[in-house]
Amino acid sequence: MEGLRRGLSRWKRYHIKVHLADEALLLPLTVRPRDTLSDLRAQLVGQGVSSWKRAFYYNARRLDDHQTVRDARLQDGSVLLLVSDPSEAQRLTPAIPALWEAEASRSLESRSSRPAWPTW
């Protein structure tokens, strides 16, 4: 059964997005669970984006280039942050869900998931 599961993971694809904080871009990528972050960098270079001296962040933690998509626990719809300055990652991490939410609803404005009034 484990061999079948491993064989099927070869065909599994995740549609993720990479948020380039320096250029204010959100790029879609299609990845496999066994792809490494270095493979993601290669895809970005293929799209004309340099990732030199930049770090990937996911859920406020830095990812290493040798990690696979599975090791980083990325899922379909995940958003990675690619920044050159680590302090910028801490500042921008709370904005990622709002950006994703805005794109999902095709709205031009990002919305907060918090209610506008107090809920007591």
Swiss-Prot record:
Domain annotation Ubiquitin-like: ranges: 14-83
Entry comment describing in which tissues the protein is expressed: Detected in stratum corneum (at protein level).
Protein name: Ubiquitin domain-containing protein TINCR
Taxonomic lineage: Eukaryota, Metazoa, Chordata, Craniata, Vertebrata
Name of the encoding gene: TINCR
